[in-house]
Amino acid sequence: LTGGFYLKGENTLYGEFALKTLDNIRVEKSFIFPSSISLGCGIMGSLSGFVDIQRKMIEISDEVYIAADSSKFEKTSLIKTADLNPRYTYITDSGISAEIKQIYESNGIHLITE
């Protein structure tokens, strides 16, 4: 556990203490669950403390997995977490439209739907 403030709805710890703890570790894989994803705005969230933790996890991870259901694509939220990056693995459900999937693929973003 990192310590910090507990965000019950997200079941996570956040805040300056949590961020400082994460400064001292490296992780193999991180799973990020954004509020929204769009080609124009990137990976986004709606709670600043939670977004800070997501940013830090991306920074300290060897592999980054972005998991979002299909309803979150081509939507925006309040705070940008990160740019879309072809090195990340994007996981969604099979409900994503063929058109949206093709647009992302043509921009170098591969979506795993299985």
Model-derived features: where do they sit?
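Conserved phosphate- and dinucleotide-binding cores of soluble alpha/beta proteins
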Residues: 1-114
